[in-house]
């Protein structure tokens, strides 16, 4: 089973296509609509407004519960939940880190340029860097060195947090890795945007 977590734009054609690619490779792949209670991202043309009116109102706890439900559904519909993984892009990259700490059934995660640190609030009480010590599945972090929203220093901070967790015996933290593509911007996997970079996206 592979859970595919969208960017802030929701499950649009790009995310559907990524999910189909996993399905064609033989996985039961699911891309849940995680913003449905707050609104429809496809109705927004302005990112700042989308962020303010929908994304900021989505609690991490709600997302974790929805993903638990999606995984449970997969188990009842032919999926092997003993071999479950998660991958996500941008907003979904952050969720990938969180879910790899939340659910012990997850065996691996791949986080594409997901935020790892920042200000906390009631809906986002902890970021990945604060959860490194209790990570339950190894995560492969794929990040761009030219990402203006997630600086290389943030990647290095997360590496350090994972190293400290590994030194204290956390096997998932020890097995986690990063690949930093020096010239890649944010959203380098998004093949419908000008940020797309074929080499790191297909590496």
Regions of interest found by a model, annotated:
Residues 146-150:
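Acidic catalytic loop of the alpha/beta-hydrolase fold
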Residues 67-134:
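Primarily recognizes the serine-hydrolase "nucleophile elbow" in alpha/beta-hydrolase
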Residues 1-79, 127, 188-193:
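Serine-hydrolase catalytic machinery in alpha/beta-hydrolase-like enzymes
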Residues 27, 34, 114, 181-183:
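Active-site loop/turn elements of alpha/beta-hydrolase fold enzymes
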Residues 165-203:
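C-terminal catalytic histidine-bearing segment of alpha/beta-hydrolase fold enzymes
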Residues 135, 141-143:
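Short beta-strand/loop motif that positions the catalytic acidic residue
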Residues 18, 128, 151-164, 177:
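Short alpha-helix in the alpha/beta-hydrolase fold that links the catalytic acid
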Residues 30-31, 111, 141:
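Hydrophobic residues in well-ordered beta-strands that form the structural core
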């Amino acid at each position: 089973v592979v859970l595919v977590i969208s960017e802030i734009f929701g499950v649009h054609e790009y995310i559907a296509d990524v999910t189909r690619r996993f399905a064609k490779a033989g996985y039961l792949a699911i891309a849940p609509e995680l913003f449905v209670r707050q609104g429809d991202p496809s109705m927004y043309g302005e990112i700042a407004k989308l962020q303010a009116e929908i994304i900021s109102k989505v609690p991490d706890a709600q997302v974790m519960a929805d993903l638990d439900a999606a995984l449970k559904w997969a188990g009842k519909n032919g999926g092997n939940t003993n071999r479950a993984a998660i991958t996500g892009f941008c907003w979904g990259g952050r969720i990938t880190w969180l879910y790899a700490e939340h659910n012990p059934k997850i065996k691996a995660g791949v986080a594409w340029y997901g935020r790892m640190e920042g200000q906390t609030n009631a809906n986002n009480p902890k970021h990945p860097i604060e959860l490194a010590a209790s990570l339950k599945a190894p995560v492969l972090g794929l990040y761009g060195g030219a990402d203006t929203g997630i600086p290389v220093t943030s990647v290095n901070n997360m590496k350090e947090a994972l190293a400290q967790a590994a030194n204290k015996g956390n096997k998932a933290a020890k097995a986690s890795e990063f690949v930093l593509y020096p010239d890649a911007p944010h959203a380098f996997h998004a093949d419908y945007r000008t940020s797309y970079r074929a080499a790191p996206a297909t590496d």
